[in-house]
């Protein structure tokens, strides 16, 4: 891929993308302070919301479902075979258990890391389900696995964050920002009233004003200009209240010199946010305000247009 072209190449029919992290548009910056590196042009296979061990959690809730650990792992390796990338980036919620994973989930993660690091290096961007990830990696004694802070990481020209909390400023200043967490889907209705739910990509200009307002605030927990209120003592997850309109009315011009890409969930058992159903709010504290002109794409590449009007 030539510098200046789209750095995000969704893999057809798959909830994964090849991301080229080389600096673009004359921007040579590369973050090494938060686990980034300076290998410009590295191509990474990026997936979000793998949720290893999900079936364990479902069984605890009384839902009998066999483990899909081997299937998940084989799907990922098949994508590596197809894309021939040099690195895998997990865009948060690689694990499913919040906190310390149990033995079955830990074993799935260890086998996954062992098989992946025989082929590529691995970056785990911490999500809200990845609290015990450093311990898993340390106990397994596996090299070539890097776990980032929850604020995300910038690799070359691309910022990566899970999306459950506010990313670091250098992450959101990247020309392209990738997040997960939402498991975005659309509910589609056919001509006879039948309905189905499809996973999607959300892509559009990144409106940086909510991040600017947060940086400029007096750290009092309120970003009044963008209609976002963060309760004291939270990181900005599901409990955040927001106006939910995505409207630019009465606000200064958008600062949209970058792109935001919301990844579909890799694990197809986790459900998702119906982004075209007004009653379903976003989970991320900075959506939909930072993606007011976002468009939806099916996994086969079909462009659906404005996600709110699908």
Predicted regions mapped to residue ranges:
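A contiguous pocket-lining binding segment that forms or flanks enzyme active sites
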Residues: 139-218
């Amino acid at each position: 891929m030539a510098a200046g072209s789209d750095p995000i190449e969704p893999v057809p029919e798959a909830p994964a993308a090849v991301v080229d992290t080389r600096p673009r548009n004359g921007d040579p910056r590369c973050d090494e302070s938060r686990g980034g590196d300076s290998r410009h042009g590295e191509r990474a296979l990026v997936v979000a919301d793998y949720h290893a061990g999900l079936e364990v959690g479902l069984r605890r809730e009384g839902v009998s479902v066999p483990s899909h650990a081997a299937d998940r792992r084989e799907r990922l390796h098949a994508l590596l075979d197809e894309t021939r990338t040099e690195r895998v980036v997990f865009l948060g919620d690689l694990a499913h258990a919040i906190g310390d994973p149990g033995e079955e989930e830990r074993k799935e993660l260890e086998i996954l890391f062992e098989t992946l690091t025989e082929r590529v290096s691995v970056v785990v961007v911490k999500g809200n389900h990845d609290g015990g990830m450093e311990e898993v990696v340390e106990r397994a004694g596996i090299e070539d696995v890097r776990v980032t802070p929850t604020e995300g990481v910038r690799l070359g020209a691309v910022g990566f964050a899970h999306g459950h909390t506010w990313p670091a400023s250098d992450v959101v200043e990247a020309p392209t920002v990738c997040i997960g967490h939402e498991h975005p889907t659309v509910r589609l209705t056919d001509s006879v009233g039948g309905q189905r739910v499809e996973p999607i990509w959300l892509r559009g200009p990144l409106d940086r004003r909510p991040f600017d307002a947060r940086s400029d605030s007096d750290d009092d927990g309120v970003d009044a200009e963008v209609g976002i209120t963060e309760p004291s003592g939270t990181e900005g997850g599901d409990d955040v209240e927001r106006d939910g309109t995505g409207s630019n009315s009465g606000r200064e011009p958008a600062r949209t010199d970058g792109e935001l890409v919301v990844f579909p969930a890799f694990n197809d058992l986790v459900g998702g946010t119906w982004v075209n159903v007004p009653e379903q709010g976003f989970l991320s504290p900075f959506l939909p305000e930072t993606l007011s002109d976002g468009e939806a794409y099916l996994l086969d590449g079909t462009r659906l247009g404005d996600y709110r009007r699908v």
